[in-house]
Design a protein with these regions (language model features):
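Acidic-enriched and Gly/Ser
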Residues: 1-150
């Protein structure tokens, strides 16, 4: 089963939400809200590649997806519905614009035009700075292919 334009993925650990934390061998629920974007699972396992896709991502790789990909929502009548990305049996369509990074062979890579930076700590100077990080200064951690060519 392959889609012409979308990746077919399933949530990591088959869970749409990461809303539990194990403390002392007991699972505690950290959020019961399905609207809470912080509890949404953001990692997906690639099940199938798009037919037109020709790139480095392979079946079994992990994608870092948008927080709305796996979410439930409620319609106008209060009925629970799956998001527009839902396909069937805990499988979802993911467009190339809906994910930012992918993990291949246990190493993360940025996807498409996205890049990821790490803030730089404020350096001591004569001028007092009331911040812990330098404004508008960062270290490139995961560059995209366009930036690598520059």
């Amino acid at each position: 089963m392959r889609s012409p334009y979308n990746f077919i993925v399933k949530p990591l650990n088959n869970k749409r939400y990461n809303n539990t934390k194990k403390i002392g061998g007991i699972d505690f629920v950290t959020s019961t809200s399905q609207e809470n974007h912080i509890a949404s699972n953001r990692e997906a396992i690639v099940i199938s590649l798009p037919i037109i896709y020709n790139g480095p991502i392979e079946i079994g790789d992990t994608l870092l997806v948008h927080h709305n990909v796996f979410k439930f929502y409620y319609d106008m009548k209060g009925r629970q519905k799956s998001c527009k990305s839902f396909f069937r049996d805990n499988l979802f369509f993911v467009d190339s614009e809906q994910f930012y990074m992918y993990k291949h062979n246990n190493k993360w890579y940025s996807h498409d035009r996205y890049c990821f930076v790490k803030p730089v700590k404020t350096k001591k100077s004569i001028i007092y700075k009331n911040t812990s990080e330098e404004p508008l200064v960062a270290e490139m951690i995961y560059p995209n292919t366009y930036l690598k060519k520059q």
